[in-house]
């Protein structure tokens, strides 16, 4: 299981971890349910980063939309392959999933 799961009540707001633009917003056939991917671009380390937010009860952004850090992008839910309300969060570096704990402060 790649990513970090955060238990939360259904409907709890989900906020963008960093500014960027919405690459994907919608339904996943791969088990994520309602999900959003935000592309954050190339950083000073030369790598590109994106974040993924999954199992939302509702998405509040659309593909192509620019979002700012802290903007509400969806609501916690249990869609897709999920057994209860939670946020599944992933960080991707150059398109590959990496340990999100590296980025928590």
Roles of regions detected by a PLM:
Residues 1-18, 39-40, 93:
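Short glycine/threonine/proline-enriched tight-turn/helix- or strand-capping micro-motif at secondary-structure
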Residues 6, 35-38, 68-80:
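Short hydrophobic beta/alpha edge segments that flank linear recognition/processing sites
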Residues 8-10, 86, 97-99:
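Secondary-structure boundary/capping motif
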Residues 11, 58-61, 81:
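Disulfide-stabilized cysteine-rich extracellular repeat microdomains
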Residues 13-24, 61-76:
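Short, well-structured beta-strand-loop connectors
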Residues 16-58, 85-91:
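Zn2+-dependent peptidoglycan hydrolase active-site motif and core
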Residues 28, 56, 78-79, 103:
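Residue-level structural signal for beta-strand termini and adjacent loop
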Residues 43-47, 58-72, 90-105:
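Acidic, glycine-rich catalytic/binding loops that coordinate metals and/or anionic ligands
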């Amino acid at each position: 299981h790649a990513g970090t799961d955060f238990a939360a009540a259904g409907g709890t707001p989900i906020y963008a971890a960093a500014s960027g633009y919405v690459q994907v917003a919608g339904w996943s056939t791969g088990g994520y349910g309602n999900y959003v991917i935000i592309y954050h671009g190339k950083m000073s380390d030369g790598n590109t980063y994106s974040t993924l937010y999954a199992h939302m009860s509702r998405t509040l952004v659309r593909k192509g939309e620019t979002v700012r850090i802290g903007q509400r992008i969806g609501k916690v839910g249990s869609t897709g392959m999920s057994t209860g309300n939670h946020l599944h969060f992933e960080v991707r570096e150059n398109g590959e999933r990496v340990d999100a704990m590296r980025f928590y402060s």
